[in-house]
Amino acid sequence: MEEPNAAPLPSRLARLLSALFYGTCSFLIVLVNKALLTTYGFPSPIVLGIGQMATTIMILYVFKLNKIIHFPDFDKKIPGKLFPLPLLYVGNHISGLSSTSKLSLPMFTVLRKFTIPFTLLLEAIILGTQYSLNIILSVLAIVLGAFIAAGSDLTFNLEGYVFVFLNDIFTAANGVYTKQKMDPKELGKYGVLFYNACFMLIPTVIISVSTGDFQQATEFRHWKNVLFIIQFLLSCLLGFLLMYSTALCSYYNSALTTAVVGAIKNVSVAYIGMLVGGDYIFSLLNFIGLNICMAGGLRYSFLTLSSQLKPKQPVDEESIPLDLKS
């Protein structure tokens, strides 16, 4: 495998399209999962996650067999190369489920924004990435805007705070280590996705069975409903696309950019909620905070896309037509 001395930087278009791809997938899966879990009342979110992991494994394996993509065959070194991603995934999942049930939605949204500064900090520590003062101020503006938006709902729940901050740390660490592990000389982005899903599938099935989640899924009354099955399969496909687009966005940009795109998506959903749906309750403080959040996110996007000082990127030796065309 030959490596040139100077690895080409990804184009501005590649960085932009990968970020838009991630934002779109993240938005769509929220809509589909909301329909499944709320409208249909599907009682088993863990089973839904299992379906998404199984779909990821099947799609990537079929693509590998047909030589559309490449990633290393399994050997005894793979677990060491992937560590600690599976553990971070479990921690992220458990802390996320625990925190959502103990905090109000506005406060949960605020505290989840701390994923962004945690990501910035971990990128500096683990990857050695340095950011300008303007980038740091843009990140702080997003967090400040989130606090202002939820200013009327600053409830305190120590257990909830602990879980959500753990969730932030696990999410940030997962993004940064995913970025680190995607070196084409090692696992590459497809190898990271495939083996992470493989290692997590069996433990997740065990958790689902032991908690009664799997039994609830088998007893669900809508399995003969064609529309439900279509949406369930769509959620599984979108789960794969979300994992893929997250890796792609982190690969061409950074884990920090991926976190900021997620924040911009959340604010965009709030804006849409003002116009349609009827469940947005207007308050001046909330509206001001949302605008500060969006301004910080857009400022970050402008600075990132216009910057000429980009961190080194590994040569993408696994480029396939699926990249940026999904």
Curated annotation (Swiss-Prot):
It is a multi-pass membrane protein. InterPro entries: Sugar_P_trans_dom (IPR004853), TPT_transporter (IPR050186). Keywords: Antiport, Golgi apparatus, Membrane, Sugar transport, Transmembrane, Transmembrane helix, Transport. GO terms for biological process: heparan sulfate proteoglycan biosynthetic process. It catalyses: UMP(out) + UDP-N-acetyl-alpha-D-glucosamine(in) = UMP(in) + UDP-N-acetyl-alpha-D-glucosamine(out); UMP(out) + UDP-alpha-D-glucose(in) = UMP(in) + UDP-alpha-D-glucose(out). Residues 37-41, 152-155, 211-225, 277-280 are cytoplasmic. It is found in: Golgi apparatus membrane. GO terms for cellular component: Golgi apparatus; Golgi membrane. One of its GO terms (molecular function) is nucleotide-sugar transmembrane transporter activity. The chain crosses the membrane at residues 16-36, 42-62, 131-151, 156-176, 190-210, 226-246, 254-276, 281-303. The keyword Amino-acid biosynthesis does not apply. Residues 1-15, 63-130, 177-189, 247-253, 304-326 are extracellular. Pfam families: TPT (PF03151). Nucleotide sugar antiporter transporting UDP-N-acetylglucosamine (UDP-GlcNAc) and UDP-glucose (UDP-Glc) from the cytosol into the lumen of the Golgi in exchange of UMP. By supplying UDP-N-acetylglucosamine, a donor substrate to heparan sulfate synthases, probably takes part in the synthesis of these glycoconjugates. PANTHER family: SOLUTE CARRIER FAMILY 35. This is Nucleotide sugar transporter SLC35D2. It comes from Mus musculus (Mouse).
